[in-house]
Amino acid sequence: RYTSKEFMKLEWDHIWTKIWLRGGLTQDLKEANDYITTEIGNYSILITRGEDMKARAFYNVCKHRGNTLAQQKMGKIDKTFKCSYHRWQYDAAGQLVDAPDPHTFPQGVCDPSLHLTELPCEEWNGWIMYSLNPDVRPLDEWLGPVKAHLEAYNFDKMDLVMDMTVEWNCNWKASVDAFNETYHVWGTHPQLMDWLDDQNVQIDLYDIHNRYLVPFGVPSPRPHIDQEVIGPNLEVYMEQNGVDPKDFKGNAQEARRAIQLAQRERADEMGWDFSNLNDDQLSDDYHYCVFPNVTLNTH
């Protein structure tokens, strides 16, 4: 499952070409004629914001000779995408609007068969989702209960502060596996043990999606971890979340609740809306996996 090309082909045929995929963020397409590109398998995908402010997804290839249309990861067109091969021009809605020597095309350059191939595309909660499957089920139905869970965070009202790409020389599932359990914490992240409970973890399954809830701000219950003394990493976590460890009179078991109260208390001052979140969500990691490969550490 991790090294077989035959199994990879099965994944392509039954997963990647059938489901909803995350294409980017709504804030990447703030204005009409903005665009981004993304890749899945051997395909390049073009996602645009039309003059009507609708987001659309297309195969990023000119319909004439299959040349890559948009060469950059993101940008803004004046009015059209211009193919660098024969100068065919498409607007942000995927319509072919001009081609040299139009009289040589008996069907006319405005024929629908010459427009870019459009893919299902929807915006949701600050995300832009697309699918290679023209018959994909509605996004709301595909997300199931995870949709309402994640909408509570109002991602669409947040601003991106860092965007980083790290390439791993491994099968994609090796990465996803690592973000679907806390069994590895002791071996890989022992420095986290004084402020993260790696054992009392709630796991919820929602059809093809899942989440697990990891208590933060409390020591691991493993026998070698002090349950009373506030360790150095717990001190840092407390400071990050509005609790001064120098003034705190409680022990390590009481820090998590103090963090939750501090977050509520300073929410208005910081401009945070926690009205849809419970207290545990203010301290813990509500970790979601949107099938098959999107993981979210919401804390």
Predicted regions and their residues:
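Non-catalytic accessory segments flanking enzyme active sites
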Residues: R1-G41, I45-L46
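A broad, structural surface signal
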Residues: K9, D13, T17, N60-N67, ...
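Tryptophan-centered motif/residue detector
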Residues: W16, W20, W88, W124-W127, ...
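Short Pro/Gly-enriched beta-strand edge/turn motifs at strand-loop
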Residues: T17-L29, A99-F105, Y288-P292
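Short amphipathic alpha-helical segments with coiled-coil-like heptad repeat character
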Residues: T17-W20, A70, Y183-G187
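Residue-level detector of alpha-helical recognition elements and their boundaries
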Residues: T26, I77, P190-Q191
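Rieske [2Fe-2S] iron-sulfur-binding domain
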Residues: L29-P134, D140-A152
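C-terminal catalytic domain of Rieske-type non-heme iron oxygenases
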Residues: R49, K54, P120-E122, W127-H299
